[in-house]
Amino acid sequence: MLSSNVPARKLPELAGSRPNGVVVDPNNLTPFLRMEGPRMRIVDGQFSPTPRRDFLKVSGASLSAAAVSGLAQAAQTTTEQKLPSIQVGPHRISRLVVGWNPIGGHSHTTWTMAQFMRQYFTLDRVVEFLRKCESEGITAWQFDHTDIGVGAIQRLRELGTNMKFICLHAERAIDAPIKKVIDDTGCIAIVHHGGVTDALFRAGQHQKVHDFVKKVHDHGVLAGVSAHNPDNIKRIADEGWEVDLFMCCFYYVTRPREEQLEKLGKVAVYEPYYESDPDEMTAVMRQVSQPCLGFKILAAGRLAWTQKQVELCFRRAFERIKPTDGVIVGMFPVYFDEVAADAAYTRQYGQIA
């Protein structure tokens, strides 16, 4: 049963203070909940917006007492525990990989949230955030080759880290050459960007993706392909490309307008997220032999209104994928310790028998 009077738990913060909210009576939330709905919560007696992206991830009114207790216990023990891990080439990485999108300001929701993410994640905060991830047992980061991505990796190495780095890249005209990516970051793998993959396959230019994979291998690192369309992952596997890993989006968000009209008779506003998408992608993930990293398991925050939702998404993700697969999850821990919570869910549901 969900508790209606659980006080907000004080959680560790990254550098910088959370924005001040309006001081309210935690026992009289009715006018505020009526005004703002479930996107707000009380933190230390203050009224604050609570997004994962711009969506509610946790509220005192929606967490059960048992869940709060469990997360608190997990936070105390995580430094002594390791996360379940998988093999990617010669490297062992945690089944939970921290994602890039919040750091890069890719909110998949609103321009305002994108700006908030970019402004929040300064270089210092990114480094502190990644060190927090590593302390919770997360040993891999999927990043983009940008100034802040490169700077964070170089700073982490100066401070000392065992974290592995996986770069999402495409070597378009706007992108750095593959050699520079490797020289700058020492990444263990470079994965072809999923949005570009889907566009090239749709245009009949899938050979460009295959050539990218070969070129990455020529530079001596693992090569992967990301996609949102499960048919593209299946085709690559069926054709026997020399791919070391896949990144597989749980939602076919690049589904083109004409395909939506043909199959559904209607078109979603902005990105389409459909309930059946995870089943379709994970069915393909189970069929391919390579390790797969599933991403957008929370539908870019659309399934993160409560911790019960988040926990369910983690459980279902690990139930659907192979034991040799993992998940990539972006985190925005401004108001809630998402790192500790997500690590706890991975320990609970991602154990490999």
Locations of regions flagged by a protein language model:
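Active-site-adjacent beta->alpha loops and helix N-cap segments on the catalytic face
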Residues: 146-156, 174, 198-211
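Conserved, mostly hydrophobic/aromatic
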Residues: 98, 223, 292
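N-terminal amphipathic alpha-helix/helix-capping segment at the start of soluble metabolic enzymes
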Residues: 60, 64, 71, 75-101, ...
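N-terminal export signals
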Residues: 34-49, 54-75
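N-terminal secretory signal peptides
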Residues: 1-50
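Structured C-terminal cap/extension of enzyme domains
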Residues: 56-67, 86-95, 126-128, 157-159, ...
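Short, acidic/polar
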Residues: 121-132, 173-182, 309-316
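Glycine-enriched alpha-helix->loop->beta-strand junction motifs that scaffold or abut catalytic
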Residues: 184-188, 238-247, 289-290, 321-324
